[in-house]
Amino acid sequence: MNSVAPTTPIPNPLQSQSGFAVPPGALEAEIDELITHYPQKRSASLMVLHAIQEHFGWISQEAVEWSAHKLGLQPINIYELVTFYPMFRASPVGKYQIKVCRTLSCALGGSHALHKHFCEKLGLDAHAHGLQTTKDGKFTVEFVECLAGCGTAPVMMCNDDFTKA
């Protein structure tokens, strides 16, 4: 018995109540082109996530589901990447992202005081876990794992700019 695929297209989860919508062809065309550089679609997963985050500023659950569908994977496969790699954001962040290293070298070099200083200046809770964003949406502060500058601790990043003491 021959089965016929449904003719109803799968809805694009980026077009949802969260306000996400792929620009007509622009982002999807970029992603389609990225995928062609890899022997298997799944191998493009990180690059697809980078493209989505660069466009939207973060990776929503809808984007996870859309990416999984696009790459022929299960959403959990994409979610694992989003939650494993510290460069990906699963929630909205401020225009300015301040990341302070909290690993041993930086902690001994004063990263906790640096983090506390930023939080106090921006009206955030210095003792809260995870990332925090100011009410105006301008700044996000978070403790992160090693930023690979142990010899010049403490280190931090503001957006993509690496800063050391």
Functional labels for PLM-detected ranges:
Residues 1-165:
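Signature of N-terminal electron-transfer/Fe-S-associated modules in redox systems
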